[in-house]
């Protein structure tokens, strides 16, 4: 009975150490190679309010059990013995669904409850009955009837060298599902992964496992931008250096094993198809990066490459599967075997969230109409009708509008960081050039220091395109602001981009997703934990479209913008021919654009929107949002006071509110008073209570004579703690580690200080009493 009571009183950590871990190891699981404890599989969502950011909680499993590295079989969720054996099951199942794990276990140290994700059945096991790795593996593949060759393929190790990054959970799922599909004989495979989630690294591991197993010996990697191919060879595909080549010109060397090429390089034109230099069965595997950009279009020259090598396994990878009358990824590749969306990436903390600044110019919201018989600056009579954002910079140019946009961009950068990498998306090349000029004039001081502060990077401009590598390089200061049209909508890995400006008309969901993807990469060491979208043309309405972040479905969208498809063989001038990388931009408009000056343009309204915990844009002010969510958790002041007073560590309440998107530091900045205590800030925002400063609360404690309950050194310690609260906040005095720092060192070691209060428990009780006194009024 004594032992039972002892077990019942154990912490969860003790239960794991003394019962669960020994049971798992006793079943044959290798502690070093097959058991991963305290596995954090997300980084915690980045929460943004104002300019303040914080991380949400990371998701974590107690145990993740592997058959082989990166081939997980089971999750074990532990609870202390005061819980039932199955108390952790629901949370474990939720994690198993995310992590693609076939078996789930919950334990309180008495035994295990098992849940089979494939059959849905559950059973209880004793500690001694926990299954071995081989038992679970055979159950997992039992219905598949794999041949030895197939099993060897699906267990082929990942490429790994000491110091290498390890795959994130979603990359591991994408890699394993793809290799499994190939093992089963599937020859058309589609993977959908949001921009910035490591598609190229995922492709590398897939290719390496298939190549190393001997299943695929000749491999083609197709991309549509030179920079994509070069980045791939220099970074993720570097381990293939000795067997890898880039197809250039007409030299096709068949001695390599991995070939990288632009679609355009292999496709050629109607009369010349370089891909035919290879035999149709030359390649075993073709991986198509950004496959939405034309490979699945039935009449495209790129599609002919895929059909020519029809016997090869073909894997399409994209952030934005395209489904229109002309193009269908799904009808060609089939349903995606795995989708990892932008929302998932942001929720997991692997992608940067965004805040949206919507700017309403008066001429955009109200329209503009010429006076009767009005001529433009070139002498053309302007067609008499009302013009709006669909016309601006396409049919009609208002110079003052361009200036107004440039001024607002510049003001934003001056208020935040003038060297924040910025991409301005324009209607066409002509608009991008005029916007460049306007931004140069608004930032002439920095342009005088370095002419590359503002650059136009478009398909027709060799000088601008030459600066693209410098723009995306993390250690390169210039260019800072780039104006563009189509060239930078996809494939540009600019981790440091912190401002995206939309001054173009976007009707294509595919293009919208790709543009937003330019900013979603996190770079905390660069100071980038979120990015801002400045929207002048209401493009962000597409965020509300269920199609924006849902699973891809086969749809018809007659409004899809055909202008985003690149071409390898453009018409004769004045349309610009593509550069060496096949990159093209919009051709100049042949129709005359009216251009006017002397039109007064002003900002009519602005609103800031934040990405909330549900993945939606909220328009409320930080204060209003915080008040609503605090009241959602604590409806009355009394309920909040009860929770605050009953919580031993006040930080737990702060953390809970933070998970709901309430950042007290942002509220403190808005209030303009750094000396307000967290408690007072919450009461002031949510319940309209007049706040006291920390100094006022500390002085009230002293005035009431509370410290005189103690004498000697104990009183001095509490007085020092009260000073610490006044200067730092309640979280500091809750932390026992502060006793190891000044000014407490003069009182002795933490153990010696605790003895002044009768021991550790007495010290903790003294801290609780001090907290009650602090918040007594």
Q: Where is each model-derived feature located?
A:
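Interdomain helical connector at the RecA1-RecA2 junction of SF1/SF2 helicase-like NTPases
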Residues: 327-420
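Catalytic cores and motor modules of nucleic-acid processing enzymes
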Residues: 413-414, 431-435, 443, 453, ...
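A conserved SF2-helicase RecA2
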Residues: 343-348, 352, 522-579, 587-594, ...
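SF2 helicase catalytic motif II
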Residues: 276-315
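ATP-dependent helicase/translocase motor core
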Residues: 2-218, 223, 227-242, 254-258, ...
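Conserved RecA-like P-loop NTPase helicase motor core
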Residues: 82, 265, 293, 455-562
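Structural recognition of the conserved hydrophobic beta-strand(s) that form the central parallel beta-sheet
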Residues: 105-107, 259-262, 313-318, 482-483
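Conserved C-terminal RecA-like helicase domain
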Residues: 257, 388-482
């Amino acid at each position: 009975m004594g032992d039972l009571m002892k077990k019942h009183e154990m912490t969860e950590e003790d239960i794991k150490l003394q019962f669960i871990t020994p049971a798992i190891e006793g079943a044959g699981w290798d502690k070093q190679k097959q058991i991963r404890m305290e596995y954090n599989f997300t980084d915690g969502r980045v929460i943004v309010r104002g300019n303040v950011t914080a991380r949400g909680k990371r998701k974590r499993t107690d145990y993740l059990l592997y058959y082989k590295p990166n081939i997980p079989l089971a999750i074990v969720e532990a609870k202390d013995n005061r819980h039932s054996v199955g108390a952790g099951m629901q949370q474990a199942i939720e994690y198993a669904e995310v992590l693609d794990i076939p078996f789930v276990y919950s334990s309180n140290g008495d035994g295990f409850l098992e849940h089979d994700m494939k059959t849905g059945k559950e059973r209880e096991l004793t500690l001694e009955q926990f299954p071995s790795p081989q038992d679970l593996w055979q159950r997992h593949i039992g219905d598949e009837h794999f041949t030895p060759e197939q099993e060897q393929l699906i267990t082929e190790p990942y490429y790994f060298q000491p110091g290498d990054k390890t795959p994130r959970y979603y990359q591991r799922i994408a890699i394993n599902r793809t290799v499994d599909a190939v093992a089963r004989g599937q020859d058309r495979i589609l993977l959908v992964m949001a921009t910035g989630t490591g598609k190229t690294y995922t492709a590398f591991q897939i290719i390496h496992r298939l190549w190393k197993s001997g299943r695929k010996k000749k491999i083609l990697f197709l991309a549509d931008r030179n920079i994509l191919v070069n980045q791939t060879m220099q970074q993720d595909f570097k381990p293939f250096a000795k067997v890898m080549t880039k197809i250039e010109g007409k030299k096709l060397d068949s001695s390599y094993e991995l070939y990288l090429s632009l679609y355009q390089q292999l496709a050629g034109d109607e009369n010349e198809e370089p891909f035919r230099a290879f035999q149709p069965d030359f390649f075993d595997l073709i991986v198509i990066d950004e496959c939405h950009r034309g490979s699945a279009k039935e009449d495209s020259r790129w599609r002919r490459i895929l059909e020519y090598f029809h016997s090869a396994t073909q894997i399409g990878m994209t952030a934005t599967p395209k489904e229109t009358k002309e193009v269908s990824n799904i009808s060609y590749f089939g349903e995606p075997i795995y989708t990892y969306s932008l929302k998932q990436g942001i929720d997991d903390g692997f992608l940067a969230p965004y805040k949206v600044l919507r700017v309403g110019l008066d001429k955009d919201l109200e329209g503009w109409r010429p006076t009767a018989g009005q001529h433009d600056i070139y002498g053309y009579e302007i067609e008499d009708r009302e013009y709006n954002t669909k016309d601006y910079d396409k049919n009609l140019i208002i110079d003052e509008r361009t200036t107004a946009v440039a001024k607002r961009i510049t003001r934003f950068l001056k208020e935040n960081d003038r060297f924040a990498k910025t991409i301005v998306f324009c209607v066409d090349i002509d608009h991008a050039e005029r916007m460049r000029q306007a931004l140069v004039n608004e930032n002439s001081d920095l342009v005088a220091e370095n002419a590359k502060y503002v650059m136009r990077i478009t398909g027709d401009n060799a000088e601008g395109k030459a600066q693209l590598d410098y723009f995306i390089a993390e250690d390169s200061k210039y260019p800072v602001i780039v104006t563009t049209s189509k060239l930078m909508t996809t494939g540009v890995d600019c981790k440091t981009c912190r401002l995206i400006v939309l001054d173009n008309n976007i009707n294509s969901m595919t293009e919208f997703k790709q543009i937003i993807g330019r900013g979603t990469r996190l770079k905390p060491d660069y100071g980038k934990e979120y990015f801002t979208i400045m929207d002048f043309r209401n493009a962000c309405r597409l965020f509300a479209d269920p199609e924006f972040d849902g699973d891809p479905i086969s749809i018809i969208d007659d409004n899809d913008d055909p202008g985003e498809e690149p071409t390898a063989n453009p018409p004769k001038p004045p349309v610009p021919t593509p550069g060496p990388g096949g990159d093209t931009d919009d051709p100049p408009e042949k129709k005359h654009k009216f251009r006017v000056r002397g039109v007064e343009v002003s900002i009519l309204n602005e609103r800031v929107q934040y990405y909330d915990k549900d993945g939606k844009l909220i328009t409320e002010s930080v204060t209003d949002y915080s008040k609503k969510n605090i009241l959602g958790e604590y409806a009355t002041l009394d309920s909040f006071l009860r929770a605050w007073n009953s919580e031993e560590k006040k930080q737990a309440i702060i953390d809970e509110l933070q998970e709901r998107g309430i950042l007290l530091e942002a509220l403190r900045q808005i209030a303009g008073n750094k000396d307000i205590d967290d408690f007072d800030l919450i009461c002031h925002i949510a319940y309209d209570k007049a706040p006291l400063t920390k100094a006022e609360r500390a002085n009230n404690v002293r005035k009431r004579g509370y410290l005189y309950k103690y004498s000697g050194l104990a009183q001095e310690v509490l007085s020092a703690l009260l000073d610490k609260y006044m200067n730092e906040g309640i979280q500091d005095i809750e932390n026992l580690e502060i006793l190891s720092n000044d000014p407490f060192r003069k009182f002795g070691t933490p153990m010696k200080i605790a003895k002044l209060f009768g021991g550790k428990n007495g010290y903790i009780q003294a801290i609780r009493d001090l907290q009650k006194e602090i918040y007594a009024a």
